[in-house]
């Protein structure tokens, strides 16, 4: 799968809730009402990522969870990352 250009990624960002392109990755941070709410969201994202075999980097800091997407095997952001960002949005926006 081909690495997307910055322009291609930037064109997709408006449809992605709260994602940004920074340092060659897609990143979204979400603050949850409680620590366990964030953990539950991580569990649901992990299930979807496992099913898709495309795993985000996930950082948990108390109530704030940060998801980072990049296709390491391709060395950049690909359509797989955009699709996983959409799926994470779907999970988080329920």
UniProtKB/Swiss-Prot annotation:
Coiled coil: none annotated. Its EC number is 4.2.1.96. GO terms for biological process: tetrahydrobiopterin biosynthetic process. GO terms for molecular function: 4-alpha-hydroxytetrahydrobiopterin dehydratase activity. It is an enzyme of class 4 (lyase). InterPro entries: PCD_sf (IPR036428), Pterin_deHydtase (IPR001533). Keywords: Lyase. It comes from the Bacteria. It catalyses: (4aS,6R)-4a-hydroxy-L-erythro-5,6,7,8-tetrahydrobiopterin = (6R)-L-erythro-6,7-dihydrobiopterin + H2O. Gene3D superfamilies: Transcriptional coactivator/pterin dehydratase (3.30.1360.20). Belongs to the pterin-4-alpha-carbinolamine dehydratase family. HAMAP family: Pterin_4_alpha. This is Putative pterin-4-alpha-carbinolamine dehydratase. It comes from Mycobacterium sp. (strain JLS).
